[in-house]
């Protein structure tokens, strides 16, 4: 099975629960819209959009938005919710972030949320986003930020146990390196997002035996055993941890640069 097939299989299972799970995080989406500061004239693309959480939230503030995703079931849920909310400037495209079906310099604004840790080769979709973004346009990436190096392997291992489509969480430095050549960063900030362990595993329908292993690892960490890289803690007798989300907003350079 190819990695893209693994992604489709994983998110097909998540489609019906995805929006409900992320409704508890609407304040973060609201903050994102504020930071994007759209003018209302942007032709916009959301890449690896899932159920188009950002696209639906951003639609009232841009000229139009296209939501592209690899998984048909996720887009179908996005279409249903857009219709339910009477959003009429949103469009949906089944497609691969590694080969965007658009001409160069097609969009004024591009956004992708929680996608890069599912890409097998993150540089490829990044270059594609850079290609189809207009000079002077904004690229917005909101994704998880890797924990410090000694703990990254353990952290990614548990992420992959929970969701086989997970590849690797990138560090701030790795994101900065991708932006370095063709963008000027306007925003670079991180936020801690609390996560309930049970809800997190429920979203991906993690098998019972795998859940039990993850719970055991988290409990062991809480009580002084081997670190998981998640820094889990108890809150009202529930296991919690904080994901660090990194928001980067870059403006594509107006100067052409030699390769």
Where do the model's predicted regions map?
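Short alpha-helix
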Residues: 168-182
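Class I SAM-dependent methyltransferase SAM/SAH-binding core
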Residues: 45-99
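A short SAM/SAH-binding and catalytic strip from SAM-dependent methyltransferases
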Residues: 108-121
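Conserved class I S-adenosyl-L-methionine
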Residues: 1-40, 53-57, 77, 85, 140-163, ...
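A short glycine-rich, Lys/Arg-flanked "PGG" loop and its adjoining helix->strand segment in the class I
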Residues: 123-135
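A short acidic, Gly/Pro-enriched loop at the edge of an enzyme's catalytic core
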Residues: 98-109
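Conserved Class I S-adenosyl-L-methionine
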Residues: 51, 186-259
């Amino acid at each position: 099975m190819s990695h893209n097939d693994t992604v489709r299989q994983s998110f097909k299972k998540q489609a019906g629960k995805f929006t409900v799970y992320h409704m508890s995080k609407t304040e973060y989406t609201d903050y994102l819209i504020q930071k994007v500061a759209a003018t209302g004239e942007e032709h916009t693309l959301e890449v690896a959009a899932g159920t188009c959480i950002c696209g639906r939230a951003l639609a009232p503030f841009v000229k139009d938005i296209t939501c592209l995703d690899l998984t048909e079931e996720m887009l179908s849920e996005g279409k249903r919710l857009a219709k339910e909310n009477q959003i009429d400037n949103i469009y949906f495209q089944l497609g691969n972030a590694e080969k965007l079906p658009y001409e160069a310099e097609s969009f004024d604004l591009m956004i992708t949320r929680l996608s890069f840790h599912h890409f097998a080769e993150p540089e490829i979709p990044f270059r594609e986003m850079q290609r189809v973004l207009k000079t002077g346009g904004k690229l917005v990436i909101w994704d998880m930020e890797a924990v410090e190096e000694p703990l990254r392997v353990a952290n990614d291992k548990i992420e992959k146990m929970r969701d086989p489509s997970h590849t690797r969480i990138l560090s701030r430095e790795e994101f900065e390196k991708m932006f370095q050549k063709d963008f000027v960063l306007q925003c670079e900030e991180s936020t801690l997002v609390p996560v309930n362990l049970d809800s997190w595993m429920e979203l991906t329908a993690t098998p019972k035996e795998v859940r039990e292993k993850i719970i055991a690892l988290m409990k062991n960490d809480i009580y002084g055993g081997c670190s998981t890289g998640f820094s889990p803690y108890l809150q009202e007798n529930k296991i919690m941890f904080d994901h660090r989300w990194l928001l980067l907003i870059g403006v594509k350079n107006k100067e052409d640069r030699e390769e």
